[in-house]
């Protein structure tokens, strides 16, 4: 497994899971009967992370970022309608987060903003535009409680840390590696 999903490895694999194919990124590789199979545990891990925290995301989703994890989040939430905010190639720019957030009940941060060694969000006031009961999933797991997570929680929103995704990914990867059926629970 690798912490950051990569697309470069795909050309060397014999087969892709539906999630890996749809997301265009792989973060788990297994060897099956002499063949390599690539999986993306981000998308099902994001879904499981929401479920483990008792959040049933409804309404539109705002995915912040445009890399492999963002593609996985968009795929995981595609049935809700997704707005992508990114510096390049998004539906909206980072400056337009407050306006975009007004339309959404789910926010996923799939950028390194707030991660140890990276700059924080310049402004978290977009959280004030979210309706009560909205869910904010920060995929960053170091630090465990990011500024985004803490700000969402302070506003009474459902806040989920990246540690939830990391644990869900580990369970999924273990199941892929071993064929076991570990149950996914909240961390």
PLM ranges: what are they?
Residues 45-56, 68-71, 90-95, 122:
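Active-site glycine-rich loop that binds ribose-phosphate moieties when present
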Residues 40-43, 50, 59-78:
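Glycine-rich adenosine-cofactor-binding loop
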Residues 79-94:
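NAD(P)-binding Rossmann-fold cofactor-contacting core
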Residues 7-57:
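Glycine/small-residue-rich loop that forms an oxyanion/phosphate-binding "nest" at active or ligand-binding sites
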Residues 2-4:
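Short, small-residue-biased leader/transition segments that mark boundaries at the very start
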Residues 57-60, 133:
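Phosphate-coordination loops involved in phosphoryl transfer and adenosine-cofactor binding
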Residues 48, 157-181:
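Active-site capping/gating segments
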Residues 91-160:
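Rossmann-like adenosine-cofactor binding region
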